[in-house]
Every structure is written in C-alpha cells, then in structure tokens.
Amino acid sequence: MPQLCYHLGLPNMFTGSLYPYQEESVEKMLDRGQVLLGLVMGAGKTVTTIAAIESLFESNEIDRCLVVTPASLKYQWKREIERFTNSRVVVIDGPAKLREKCWKSALSSSYIVVNPECLMRDMPFFNKINCQAIVVDEATMLKSRVSKRSKLVKKIAKPMLYRYALTGQPIENKPEELYSIMEFVDPTILGPFANFDRTFIVRDHWGKPLRYRNLMELHNSLTSCMIRKTREDIADQLPEIIHQVIPVPFDEAGASLYRTISKDLLYHLQQAMSKHGGSFNLWKHYNDPASNEAQGQIMSRLTVLRMLCDNPQLVINSSEIYADPKRPDEGSAYAHDIHSRGLMSKVNASPKLDAVVEYIEEVLAADPKNKVVLFSFFKENLRLIQKATTKLTNSVLFMGGMSAEEKDTAKQKFSNDANTRLFLSSDAGGYGVDLPMANYLISYDLPWSSGKLEQREARIIRLSSQFPHVTIATFVMQGSIEERQYEMLQQKRSINEA
C-alpha cells in the first residue's frame, strides 16, 4: 500500500490537513484503488481525493490523473488542486483551437480537469495521453447505463488501476443508478445486472421498477468499496443548521386563477386515467407515443401552476415569448392561451416575490457579513429577483447556459466582493458549487428530486463554512402544489437516510 504523504511545500505532495475521517478515507482509497467516496455533501470529498492522488504521485504509483467533473466545477477543482499541492493542473475548456492547446499542455501536467462533454468531443487528443488514475466528481453523471457519456467514461476508466467516484448521495432515488456507478468503480462488486435486478428490484407489468427490496443486503455488498459519511456522522464538524419553512398566502386574484388552472389540470389527469382503465400509470403514460399530446397537456398546466406560484409575470413573459416569431419553439402555448383570454388581467401581485425580497432585506440588514444564496427552477425568475433586489445589494447570476468561465467569475465575485451579497442560481447552474462564504440559503421554489434539494442545501453546509450556523429558508405557497411537493421531498429524504 502506498504510504500517506502529508508533508509541506514539496513537489507532488499534499500541503493541507485532514480530519480523522478524511485520513481514514484516504487510506482506504489507496489500499483498495477503486472506491465510491460517498461523503455527505460539504464533508470535503475534493480535498480528501486530492490527498489520495498526491500520495499516489509520491509513491510513483501514477504520474497523471484525469478528473471528470461537471463544467461548472472545473475551475473550482483547479483552485483546490493549486491550493493544496504544487502539482501542475490544466483545465480543458474553450473553443476547439484553445482546447487543442490545453490537451498539448496536458502532456506535461499532473492533473487534467475536463467535463464529459469536452471529453467526448476531444477523444482523439485524449487517446494520446496516458492516465493511470481517474476521478469522477458528482458521479451521478454516470447513473444511466445506456448514455453515451456513461459508456465512454467507463470505457476509458477500465484500464486504470485507480478509479474514484465522488458523490454525496450514492443512492438518490433508484438503486439501479447506483449499479451503473459501480460499473465504473468495480463491476465485480454487484455482478451481472440480471442478478442484481432479480435481487433488488420488483418490477410492474410494464417492466418499470415498482419498489425495491433487500436494501440491507445491497448496503452490505458495498462495504468493501464504499466510504459513507452522513451529516450525523460529522455533525460536530459542520455548522449548525436552522430550517425555516415560510408559508405565503395567495392574493384573491392569484388564488382564483390557481383554482381555475387546477380544475383544468384535474380534467386532463382524469382523461389520462380513463384512457388506462381507471388506473393511471405515469410511466406508461409518458412512454406511450400515443400519449405525447396528453402528456404535454398535463405538463404545460403543471408548469404554469408553478410559474403562478413563483411570479405571475413568468406566465405573461412565457406567453409573449411564445407569440414572438423570432423565438420559435420557446415559451408556453398554455401560458399564451391563459394570457390571451384575459385571465391574467387581474393578477397583478406576486406575494412570494414580495415575501422573499422582504426576507432578504431583513437578513442583509441584520449583519454586514450575511450573504444569501437563492435557488429557483426558472432562469427568468432569477432575473426578476435580481431586478427586485437591485437597491438591496449587488448580485450575481449562476445558471445553465453560462460558460464555465462565466460561472467561475460570478462565484469569485460573490466570494471576494463584500458588496455582492446575493447569489442567484438555478439547479443546473449550482450543481456541486462550494459557497462557504454564505450563511443563508433560500429555496424560492422546490425541485421534484430530494437529491437536487440536498445539492442545493449543501452549497452552504460545508466543513469550510465561515459561520457557526447556517439558515435554510423554504418558501411555500399555501393551498398549492408546493405544499404537497414539500411533503413528498421530506418523505424521500427520510427514505434516503434510512
């Protein structure tokens, strides 16, 4: 087994310090070689992995490591590697000609940091480089066994002796997704998929998972190759968490329109149930080509209900975008129908926006050190919130569609500028980003996945937090689908913890 090397200031050596549980994790990563590192989000997966890789460098086990990570985290990885080591790191980014130069630099670098999309495009360059270790950060990117991305990463990882998958939630919603991740880590652990399927998954008439079984057996089979630490395991080293659920009532006009759209949604759901003999199967509904139109009817109404909860202006904006001939295939036909029928004419208030702005104002006024991270599903909503908070503070947007460099610039401004105290992010934008300089997090609306909710909250629940306690505030419209959504997420979270 390679010896641990935590000396200071020497080439290819880790220059930081680790908590005892991180040191234990490094030892197992070095001893076994193929490991699923399942430390809870915020517990230091990155620094733990860097320590392990540096020890491999020092013991001459490897001379180059490939780090595959979401695009939004590439520069965060670069900074962490430079912070804790003297190793050379190159980030593969930019247009084709610039990436070609990056790959040439990779020949003389210890770490290559790349997102899977760039890797897929640049395989001719990668094939000229020899890596002996691979790290996949946010390993849920491998959860699909059939995706091109997953197949490619597993293929290039196969000859590498050291394979590390990093995730805060090894099981998000589906054990079969864990199986796919384990195919990357060590395919011998869970064996052939047919056996795994029979042992752990109960399927319905259409072949879709109905429920899961023998989960303790699954857990036991992973003990040799998985390192798992929950928040409870390291609670004394994390900031205290204060949860707030803030109910917001509709105004009269908004409530009336919400009821109207809800009745319309219920009608289409009943039509779908009638089609399937009174037993509505969501999977069959979504996977039956003949049901595409009905699926669109249901989802369009759900989306407009969510827009109405967030800010009625989103419905109007979506309607106008749909009507714009310069923006084909954008906007919502149903939102346009609602707007053109005059149903939005009396809906002038946005109770949730007002409540959130008031909350942010109070938080920022309470202490000049307070900083706020806010998540919302709709990117357009983030822009509306930014406009509404202009007089309170400078803010940055961080969302899908921005380049990795733009995201990194936004993060650095929020981190280093005392006057930039609001970080506005979409779920796609904020995946895995470390924001220990913030002590308040607002879920303006809720995702459907408990894993995404954990991802949101873990942005500020971190070992590196600058505060003894952090506050997570969730805003929920009363009498709306958001109340049920919140309950479902709490149930999913309980199941995941179990």
Language-model segments: which ranges?
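Conserved helix-turn-beta segment of the N-terminal RecA-like "Helicase ATP-binding" lobe
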Residues: 73-96, 189
